[in-house]
Amino acid sequence: MQLKTFAVLFLIVLAACQSNESKTSTATGPMTINGAGATFPYPIYSKWFDEYQKAHPNVRINYQSIGSGGGIKQLTAQTVFFGASDGPMTDAQLQAAPGAILHFPTVLGGVVPVYNVTGVTQPLRFNGTVLADIYLGKITKWNDAAIANLNPGVKLPADDIAVVHRSDGSGTTYIFCDFLSKVSPDYKQKVGVATSVNWPAGVGAKGNEGVSGLVRQTPGAIGYVELIYALQNKMSYGSVQNKAGQFVTASLDSVTAAATGATMPDDFRVSITNADGANAYPIASFTWLLLYEHPKDAARGSAMVDFLKWALTDGQKFAPSLGYAPLPQPVVAKEMQALGKIQ
């Protein structure tokens, strides 16, 4: 009788052990970390998350490119673990969050004016005033004298300009408006700088993808997208006159030049649009990954710190092939110190 009782107890213990092993196996599967935000860095973030998981199969990072405004809202609501934005959060947004949020620049990029003008094959030249007046609805024809004067020798059609802008909360919009507000007092007063603004003219499209698609399918259209979207979609994009009076095309070198003279504050919230320097592209920006200083989940917080350390060092080599400029080394060094705050 005692032997039978022992056998039954043994089977119960064995079953419990097997059940616990099954639970442990599930618990030790890939840690999932969810984030959302800017479409501007989506190509490089997708590459990074894929490459990082190859080397760290125990961590899976998911990212939704819903726009900077949406990313900030979801991070503030704590429905995602991290956010991403091309425009730094405002003081009011930071104060509205349930905890301190830190900004970490990840790469540099440029926003370019893309267009679909019948019969025009060569790159067009723009300046801030012309772009501002187009988006204010003041310039409505492609052969307007203001555009023609910047492009001597180019036969511009008398077609209407179809203005395309973002319909969602967008860091790309923030960068574009930040530049235009610096060079056009009228634009600053009537539109201003934000991830979502009240547009005086045009039609909206969601994401860099949406703007690219709408411009491509609309004769006479003009829009603004991150450089990689123009390159991937083989779109025409123009050079833009910088603060030094030079017409500069967006490139890795010209975007990097825009960041060269920037003084990086301790909170990393800095604007580099309309920067000094003859070679600086004027519509350039850092893009930021956003994390709570004291995350609720310490394990995920530690995993994101490890990921960022990789992204800021080994991960930078993937940036140039995707149209982004790597971070300057002094910025990386400053961020490495700041990562120690997350705990």
Each model region followed by its residue ranges:
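Flexible loop/hinge segments at secondary-structure junctions
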Residues: 18-343
